[in-house]
Design a protein with these regions (language model features):
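Structural signal for interior beta-strand "rungs" in well-ordered beta-sheet cores
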Residues: 1-84
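Long, leucine- and charge-enriched amphipathic alpha-helices
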Residues: 83-116
Length: 116
């Protein structure tokens, strides 16, 4: 474990895990065996990291993020599975449009079926 690492309560750090300097591990985080955290990493509460994962320097994960693959340095990751914050926001915006798209699709199906 590196210098100046803060670990909150109810966190589980597996065997052979390497943690860099200046890391913050919030409550209820689980890090599976042989994973490696770079320097200045912040893991939000209930983040889960699969085994043998490399987390680069200056990475932040949002609460309840599940990391299933390596994360390059400087990324902000959210969700399950973990994706970059930009992609997660894009997905959220698209999801808000879904009810209207479903209605439009149903309307188009009615129009097409009437023309047959």
């Amino acid at each position: 474990q590196g210098n100046n690492v803060k670990t909150d309560n109810l966190s589980q750090i597996g065997h052979n895990v390497s943690i860099g300097n200046n890391c913050l591990i919030c409550a209820q985080v689980g890090i599976a065996g042989s994973s490696r955290l770079g320097n200045n990493v912040v893991l939000g509460g209930q983040t889960g990291i699969s085994d043998n994962i490399l987390i680069g320097d200056n990475v932040i994960t949002g609460g309840a993020t599940k990391v299933l693959s390596n994360v390059p340095s400087g990324k902000i990751m959210l969700g399950y599975p973990a994706t970059s914050m930009d992609k997660q926001i894009e997905s959220y915006k698209a999801l808000r449009k879904l009810p209207n798209l479903v209605k439009q699709f149903a309307d188009l199906k009615k129009i097409i079926s009437k023309k047959r």
